[in-house]
From Swiss-Prot:
InterPro entries: Cobalamin-bd, Cobalamin-bd_sf, GlmS. Belongs to the methylaspartate mutase GlmS subunit family. Residues 7-140 form the B12-binding domain. Adenosylcob(III)alamin binds at S17, D18, A19, H20, V21, S65, S66, L67, N96, L97, A98, V99, G100. This is Glutamate mutase sigma subunit 1. The gene is glmS1. HAMAP family: Me_Asp_mutase_S. CDD domains: Glm_B12_BD. GO terms for biological process: anaerobic glutamate catabolic process; glutamate catabolic process via L-citramalate. It catalyses: (2S,3S)-3-methyl-L-aspartate = L-glutamate. Catalyzes the carbon skeleton rearrangement of L-glutamate to L-threo-3-methylaspartate ((2S,3S)-3-methylaspartate). Its cofactor is adenosylcob(III)alamin. Keywords: Cobalamin, Cobalt, Isomerase, Metal-binding. GO terms for molecular function: cobalamin binding; metal ion binding; methylaspartate mutase activity.
């Protein structure tokens, strides 16, 4: 990278026993194209793997995907583990988060209460999530543009 801005590091993975890989592959490509350094943990990722990766890569955000409807069970306690490790990172969760999910606002509220900064459904455009990530990381327009140019 030739510019003065370093890419922001994000951890990405599919939590729990979920083996859906397509969504995180699309997210990884979109985030990389937007200039982020992406550490993709892949599928069937345990909470401690997210925590370990965030710590070892000095990540600024942990992005959790789940499409099989059991995200609540899989994510329970994740923020306690992040806190115990002394990490202060943004956390996003997205996908088909609950079996039979009919009221996404209720699902959002549940995950916000669990400590997630942003909650997305499976229909969210990756660019929307990236724009929110830039906003939450307080990237200036100049920095975001530089990341895109140099990335």
């Amino acid at each position: 990278m030739t510019g003065k801005y370093m890419p922001r590091t994000v951890i990405l993975g599919v939590i729990g026993s979920d083996a859906h890989v397509v969504g995180i592959t699309i997210l990884e490509q979109a985030l990389s194209a937007a200039g982020f350094e992406v550490i993709n943990l892949g599928v069937q990722t345990a909470q401690d793997e997210f925590v370990s990766a965030a710590k070892s890569h000095d990540a600024e955000a942990v992005l959790v995907s789940s499409l099989y409807g059991h995200a609540r069970q899989d994510c329970e306690g994740l923020h306690d583990e992040l806190d115990d490790a002394g990490l202060d990172v943004l956390t996003y969760v997205g996908g088909n988060l609950a079996v039979g999910q009919s009221d996404f606002e209720e699902t959002q509220a549940t995950f916000r209460q669990m400590g997630f900064d942003r909650v997305f459904d499976a229909e969210t455009d990756p660019e929307e999530a990236i724009e929110m990530l830039r906003e939450d990381l307080q990237l200036t327009t100049t920095e975001a543009e530089q990341i895109r140019v140099d990335g």
